[in-house]
């Protein structure tokens, strides 16, 4: 499996519930096109523990998207990059709610 960690903050005035609803619609849209396997739950950072050692980033929210393999991930990017419908508006509904996104990808060994 191939995974992508999304680290982000919300733009002012956007609730995590609004983001979650938009993200769920986007995931369903991508699953229907076989462009994503699954998306995990949204997590809120708990930086007040000694186990949180990342001082470079100040993101509040995280979630993991899972793809069957790197090829599926690459196809999902190819689907999004042209900014064409039907994908454009549903992706924009998610991406427009976030600030300072960082994406980290890895593949299971």
Set out the residue ranges of the language-model regions:
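An amphipathic, aromatic/His-enriched active-site/gating alpha helix that lines ligand/cofactor pockets
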Residues: 25-37, 52-60, 64-103, 109
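Short, conserved charged micro-motifs
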Residues: 13-19, 71-75
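Carbohydrate-binding/catalytic loop surfaces
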Residues: 44-52
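Charged, amphipathic alpha-helical segments and their flanking helix caps
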Residues: 10, 15-17, 84-86
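Active-site-flanking beta-strand signature of metal-NTP-handling nucleotidyl enzymes
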Residues: 2-9, 62-64
């Amino acid at each position: 499996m191939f995974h992508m960690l999304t680290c982000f903050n919300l733009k002012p005035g956007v609730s995590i519930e609004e983001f979650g609803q938009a993200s769920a619609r986007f995931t369903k849209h991508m699953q229907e096109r076989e462009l994503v396997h699954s998306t995990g739950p949204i997590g809120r950072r708990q930086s007040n523990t000694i186990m949180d050692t990342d001082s470079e980033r100040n993101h509040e929210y995280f979630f993991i998207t899972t793809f069957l393999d790197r090829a599926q991930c690459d196809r999902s990017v190819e689907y999004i990059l042209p900014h064409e419908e039907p994908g454009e508006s549903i992706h924009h509904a998610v991406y427009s709610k976030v600030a300072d996104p960082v994406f980290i990808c890895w593949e299971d060994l």
